[in-house]
Amino acid sequence: MKIGFVSLGCPKNQLDTEVMLHEVLAAGYEITPEDIEADVIIVNTCGFIESAKKEAIDNILDVAWLKKNRHLKAIIVTGCLAERYGESILEEFPEVDAVLGVGSIHNIVEAIEAVTVKKKKGSSQKYYSHEDKNTVRLGGDRVLTTPEYMAYLKIAEGCDNRCAYCAIPSIRGNFRSRPMEDLVAEAKQLESLGVKELVVVAQDITRYGLDLYGKYALSELLHKITEATAIPWIRLLYCYPDKITDELIAEMRDNPRILKYIDLPLQHISDHMLSAMNRHGDRAMICETLAKLRREIPDIVIRTTFIVGFPGETEADFEELCEFVKAQKFEHAGVFPYSREEDTPAYDFPDQIDEQVKQDRMDILMRHQMEINEELNRQKIGTTVDVVCEDYDPVAEVHFGRSAADAPEIDGKVYFKSEHRIAPGSFVKVKVRRVVDYDLFGNIVTKK
């Protein structure tokens, strides 16, 4: 029997897909990358904001068409949308045969067997599993869906921050760290598979260890991983400004294998908005944290995200945010319009902002950030940057990859010419000749 997967959403959800892939293969099923060939398709959904829900629903409908018009026998929905809406998915989408909440991903083989065996017997009974997400076994063997030289390492699950706009705590549960020894062992296993870039993720990686060890232990974890492996690039995503410890800064500064790159979602800078969002800390704390990072790690690259159009955001709040962004000159920044989500405190807030105003503010702030990116990239012309090669484009006759300053999927690319074909996962030095928007173009200098 052939099983197909559709994996949506963030890297953290992608890791859940990888765990399910392993369990499905271990049970003797065949995985097919072609949906049209599949007997069962598993749609692992995102669903924490409106656009993600729409994407998930569109994919479910696409798969439902295959069930109606091809030989697809069953559809299983997992992930955040499944956790959030549960059995109502079975009611809204009669084509769906099974729904598994985020606490039930280890039941995926049972779900496949249930829906396929029952269909053979002529039963139309649905399968639904919604185990306690706060007690589910964390981690598990995986089948990597990333390029072989790069992998994500999820060090925790859930979130305790309770931001007013966010449904993640209700979807993913309370924050739970994975034991340090398990993570070190997983990093060693990933290294044995050829991984050269390890991207550390969780809902809030800087909270790591507080529940298990009574302290923030991210710096200790990173140190142990670099002692136990020789993985050359370790990258940090999803950090919170109020938990950037001196120990973490020192580890990033002094450990050459921890990239001088940090993803630090700030969401806003106006104290009025930070308080309304139930963010931890205020403008003064954020500015001090940024100043300390720049001071202690002068070449650090900071990525952040902002939400515009949150309920009650005034023109003064937005202008303060724009001026802050122009002053800070972040190397990377994403801007998102506020998404009004049920079962979050902000859903019932007064002074909801018009959708067009949200879009206009997003466009304005992104224009500011584009100008900053162009300015910072122009400063790189003539410099040499370390790049991990991702692939070769035979049409353009150039290789492409990412510098240490660019995270997978979300940041820019480096395009470079080479007299010889460079294997994906190889590290090279590239001299930058020109820039276009977020991307760099140059020539290979040496292969590392």
Give the residues covered by each predicted segment.
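Active-site proximal loops enriched in glycine and acidic residues that flank catalytic Cys/His/Asp
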Residues: 202, 238, 266-268, 304-308, ...
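Short glycine-enriched, charge-decorated loop/helix-capping segments at active-site entrances
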Residues: 47-48, 172, 212-215, 275-281, ...
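Proteins enriched for Cys/Gly/acidic motifs involved in redox and nucleic-acid/cofactor modification
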Residues: 1-208, 247, 262, 284-291, ...
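Conserved beta-strand core positions
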Residues: 3, 40-41, 151, 198, ...
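Contiguous mid-protein beta-loop-alpha structural module that forms a pocket-lining wall or clamp
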Residues: 313, 327-330
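Terminal RNA-binding accessory module
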Residues: 348-448
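Conserved, mostly hydrophobic/aromatic
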Residues: 183, 200, 236, 264, ...
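Conserved SAM/AdoMet-binding glycine-rich loop
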Residues: 74-79, 84, 89, 192-316
